[in-house]
From Swiss-Prot:
Pfam families: YgbB
Gene3D superfamilies membership: 2-C-methyl-D-erythritol 2,4-cyclodiphosphate synthase (3.30.1330.50)
Binding annotation for 4-CDP-2-C-methyl-D-erythritol 2-phosphate: 8-10, 34-35, 56-58, 61-65, 132-135, 142
Organism (species): Desulfatibacillum aliphaticivorans
Protein name: 2-C-methyl-D-erythritol 2,4-cyclodiphosphate synthase
Details of cofactor binding: Binds 1 divalent metal cation per subunit.
Amino acid sequence: MRVGYGYDVHRLVDGRPLVLGGVTIPFDKGLKGHSDADVLLHAVCDALLGAAGLGDIGMHFPDKDPKYKNIASTRLLEETGRKIAQEGYKIVNLDATLVAEAPKIGPYRQEMVSVIAKCLGLENRQVNVKATTTEGLGITGRGEGMAATCVACLE
């Protein structure tokens, strides 16, 4: 059994769609980044890569590479899943947490779980997505950005 931990944070900005867990969510701001800036999927990728001893998302999908400009993070997750499989690992489960004051993800949570599971060839029961706030503290609490964490177990 191998365990990996992923963390990511992105700034909220005007003029971009908000994509979380592969789902576009109605909101007045989106996340800034080279790709679609899906903070949740980036944390999932980092957790998986870490568990397999394959470094991090920046090593595999550098933000200076133009081919990743505005790429859907679901594509990055699919490629991460292929890399994990090529190393001979199977994903046991994922547990991801979004850290943000708004929007509430309850109405979108199950769709996020389904998207992540589909990208990785998993059953929905192998993927957990939840959210929390920082009670108004820090960059997420002030609404300046969003963060996400993820724990991945491989065998």
